[in-house]
Design a protein with these regions (language model features):
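Conserved P-loop
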Residues: 87, 94-140
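Short mixed-charge
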Residues: 139-162
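Conserved beta-strand position immediately N-terminal to the Walker
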Residues: 84
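A generic structural signal for short, solvent-exposed coil/turn residues
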Residues: 78, 108, 152-154, 164
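N-terminal accessory segments
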Residues: 1-81
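Hydrophobic side chains in beta-strands
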Residues: 88, 162-163
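Conserved small/polar residues in nucleotide/adenosyl-binding loops
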Residues: 167-172
Length: 173
């Protein structure tokens, strides 16, 4: 993966060059991550939180142990798996990672249905609110940088439904 190699090289250079040069390597690293974010779940998870304060980020501080689960979701995305089952302790990040995967699918395929389910109304409500948070706080999450054509068009708190639509700009006359 050439783009991943570019990111590794940029990350390595960040620690070896002057602050001014480091800014350029950081921007190259960031653009490379954005390039992969619509296709690679790990890149998506990393990129959408880049503008959040480090202490508020979900994925970056947990990446070392979430990576196998993220790879499982990537295998589903790539068609290598039809079913992914996850067994991890409570509070390990399963639900939040699942929310991020549903958001990625909703952005990538806004004209298709995406389903997330859970046992109990409180859990389902937290899924709904978690998904919605990424779509309604663009100053904190970079979802629309990754999927600029995807737009939130409707929500239903009672039914816990979120509808996205593929937005195409009107053609000039």
């Amino acid at each position: 993966d050439l783009n991943g190699e570019l990111r590794r090289l940029c990350a390595r250079q960040l620690h070896l060059v002057s602050p001014k040069e480091a800014d350029k390597f950081y921007e190259a690293w960031r653009k490379s991550l954005l390039f992969d974010a619509p296709y690679k779940f790990d890149a998506f998870m990393t990129y959408i939180e880049l503008d959040r304060k480090p202490e508020k980020r979900f994925y970056a501080p947990r990446r070392h142990y979430l990576k196998p689960m993220v790879q499982g979701f990537q295998d589903v995305l790539d068609g290598k798996l039809r079913l992914l089952t996850i067994s991890m302790p409570k509070r390990a990040g399963k639900s939040q990672t699942g929310i991020n995967f549903v958001n990625m699918l909703s952005g990538k395929y806004p004209d298709r249905s995406t389903l997330m389910e859970g046992t109990g109304d409180d859990l389902v409500k937290s899924f709904y609110n978690g998904c919605l948070e990424y779509l309604t706080t663009p100053n904190e999450y970079l979802f629309y940088d990754v999927f600029p054509e995807s737009r939130l068009v409707q929500t239903g708190a009672d039914t816990k439904i979120i509808n996205c639509l593929l937005y195409t700009s009107p053609s000039p006359r």
